[in-house]
Amino acid sequence: MEIKKLEAMIEAILFTMGEAVEVERIASALDHDVDTIRKIIHNMMDRYEGDERGIKIIELDNSFQMCTKAQMYEAIVKIAHVPKKHILTDVLLESLSIIAYKQPITKQQIESIRGVKSDHAVNKLVEYNLVCEVGRMDAPGRPILFGTTEDFLRNFGIASLEDLPVVAPEKVADFKMEAEEEVQLQLDI
């Protein structure tokens, strides 16, 4: 099958699905190997970025999705309803970062790290579809394990969890020292 026809079929699949589609599913549907399909999609991504187009293809954790470019927002909101923006407070961001880096994780583990109840924060993150239930811990009570979603990756502009920034070791040491000083101050009071 020629490349142009494969590109057209990939484009049709991504457009029609409207959500991220695993590269394996695309390859299977087109009776081609995954590496070839991935290369074709990456070439398409480069062309979409280079052309004056309103859409692009993004990669999300071994899946691909067609979406509009951010620069097109002004034109889109004139015709569509303005999407509700979710506000991520410091509490939500703190909880989300704990989940992102420590997943899968239970509410109790989040609360242990934060030092305060986190029910509201986790529930809001689930409501915003940034976090979801990924399973149950094999422990008494079988607590829910939480992890991030594709929407998390999409909203933060990262392709996979491996792309999360790594905290420099010297920063970790600084944070640890600050925490120890804070604990010591509380003990002195």
Swiss-Prot record:
Function: Participates in chromosomal partition during cell division. May act via the formation of a condensin-like complex containing Smc and ScpA that pull DNA away from mid-cell into both cell halves.
Protein name: Segregation and condensation protein B
Protein family according to the UniProt entry: Belongs to the ScpB family.
Organism from which the protein derives: Lachnoclostridium phytofermentans (strain ATCC 700394 / DSM 18823 / ISDg)
Keyword tags: Cell cycle, Cell division, Chromosome partition, Cytoplasm
Record has Cell cycle as a keyword: yes
Assigned GO CC terms: cytoplasm
One biological process term in Gene Ontology: DNA replication
